[in-house]
Amino acid sequence: MAKEFGRPQRVAQEMQKEIALILQREIKDPRLGMMTTVSGVEMSRDLAYAKVYVTFLNDKDEDAVKAGIKALQEASGFIRSLLGKAMRLRIVPELTFFYDNSLVEGMRMSNLVTSVVKHDEERRVNPDDSKED
């Protein structure tokens, strides 16, 4: 029977917390002037590689997002060394940062659903207007 919540998931969960603290307290890069949130971490089975998914507070500006991801990639060695001090791991994983747009997409989908529901209710209240379309 396979473990539902194995070691890679537990390490990823703890690593997410530690990276969030490191980004909040230790990283002083001006390109990361916007608030950075670690939305998830995926670990390889051998714990040698980690995909770190981040979101930014000001994610409307695509250039700022690209600059933020680039800054995180350049600081990944420093983050990795701090992570090695904070967590007891035999191998500190190689970090790769990705922008997580699921929050933005979720907001967009929610707005679409809200507008469709609003439009539907307007048509229900004024059925004469819909016949003219």
UniProtKB/Swiss-Prot annotation:
GO terms for cellular component: cytosol. The keyword Cytoplasm applies. One of its GO terms (molecular function) is ribosomal small subunit binding. Disruption phenotype: Severe growth defect at 26 and 30 degrees Celsius, with poor growth at 37 and 42 degrees; has decreased amounts of 70S ribosomes and polysomes and increased amounts of 30S and 50S subunits. Results in a constitutive induction of the cold-shock response; increased cold-shock and ribosomal protein synthesis continues in the presence of general translation inhibition. Less efficient processing of 5' end of 16S rRNA, increased levels of precursor 17S rRNA; effect is more pronounced in cold-shocked cells. It is found in: Cytoplasm. One of at least 4 proteins (Era, RbfA, RimM and RsgA/YjeQ) that assist in the late maturation steps of the functional core of the 30S subunit. Essential for efficient processing of pre-16S rRNA. Probably part of the 30S subunit prior to or during the final step in the processing of 16S free 30S ribosomal subunits. Probably interacts with the 5'-terminal helix region of 16S rRNA. Has affinity for free ribosomal 30S subunits but not for 70S ribosomes. Overexpression suppresses a cold-sensitive C23U 16S rRNA mutation. This is 30S ribosome-binding factor. It comes from Escherichia coli (strain K12).
